Amino acid sequence: PPELRQEIDAMIDSNYESVNNGVYKSGFARTQSAYDEAVTALFARLDELEALLEGRDWLVGEGAGRLTEADICLFPTLARFDLVYVVHFKCNLRRIIDYPNLQAFVERMIDLPGIKETCHWHHIKAHYFWSHQNINTFRIIPLGPLEGAHTR
C-alpha cells in the first residue's frame, strides 16, 4: 500500500544487512572477528523483531499490522533458519523456534494460500549442505532438525 511504502522500505532495509545477508556473512566469514560481528548483529536484529511482533501478526502497519513486502522479504530467511543456517552457517545462539513471536510469524506465513506449496524443505536443506563444499567438505546432509516450521 502506498501509504506504508516508506515504512515497508525501512523495514526491508533494516532486516537485509543483519538478517537476510547476515546469515551469509556469518556462514562465509573468514575470520573470527567477522563471524562474531555478523552473528552479534544477526541476533540483535532477531531480538528486535521478536519484540516488534509481540501482539502483532505482521511487521508493518497499525495494530496487528498487515501483510506486506517486508514480511515476504523476511520469510525465506526465517523459514530456512533452523533447518539450515543454525548448523551450516553457525548461526546457533538461538533458533527461530526459541523465539515465540518469530516462530508464530513463520507459521502464519506458511499457512497463507500458496506459500506452503513452495517450501520444499528437503530441497532447501540438500541445496545448502551440498553446494557449499568449502564449508561442508564431505557434503553431509543432516537428518534433523526434527521440529520446526518445516514439519508443518
Protein language model features and the residues they cover:
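C-terminal alpha-helical interaction module
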Residues: P1-R152
